[in-house]
Amino acid sequence: MKENVLDVLMYLFENYIDEDTEIEPDRIQLQDKLLEAGFPGAEIDRAFDWLENLANQEDQPLGQARHDSALRVYTDREVERLDARARGFLLFLEQNGVLDAGTRELVIDRIMDLDAEDISLDQLKWVTLMVLFNRPDQEAAYTWLESMMFDSPPEFLH
């Protein structure tokens, strides 16, 4: 089983993150369950580090105003990791008010912190969903993206 950090994060998000859960399992319990599920210990540790970094960034105000006319220029490294469809998806979310500039930057930061060479559109959606879930006052944006991901029929390219 060749699992990466994003696979661990997606598994955690699908199985253990529930807005209605009152008792959250601790890190050791989760690590044990992830090991039982077959994830490598190193990837589990990196996934928890990724989540801690996300939580630490959540505590810091982003402090930037939205400029509708501003254009985000991606670095070469970001372009390697995020293809045109992924960058277009981020722009789509921002233009539709799902992401503001600060949250977009947080999504990009979390993507760049993963060890993957390139990120698929589905993986980007998952990371965006995780970021929105952890942002205060983003419940509507989270719900919108979640329903788009799970309630819409799959895209078929012909």
Curated annotation (Swiss-Prot):
Signal peptide: none annotated. InterPro entries: Smg. NCBIfam families: PRK03430.1. Belongs to the Smg family. This is Protein Smg homolog. The lineage of its organism: Bacteria, Pseudomonadati, Pseudomonadota, Gammaproteobacteria, Chromatiales. The gene is smg.
